[in-house]
Amino acid sequence: MAVKNKLIHEVRAVKSKKELKYIIKAQRITETVLRYIIVKLKTGVTELEVANLIKKSFTKHGAPILAFPPIVAFGKNTANIHHEPNKTKLRNGDTIMFDIGCTVNHYCSDMTRTYFWGKPN
């Protein structure tokens, strides 16, 4: 069984041009969504509101299937890399963390970015 698993792993490690096309498309959509979200941010918005906007934006951009639930964290919540978005509001001076990704033809993007809102504390 271990030999079969190793062979499958090796075959999957090399991507065809078509597979690379799907991965690149997923990443480009993810980058587009994040640029859109950054422009829409405002003081007082909650992590949950932003996470929901991310989901809607992926659908709008042709990728309704997410790679995983979006992670949006503000302030002290950014210390938890697997934070689940909640009603925490964005405040001036907060650190913001996004971990988002989508799926295109079963190939996923996964992007994590950190920003500061206003002047960092």
PLM region spans:
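Active-site neighborhoods and metal-handling regions in enzymes and metal-associated proteins
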Residues: M1-N121
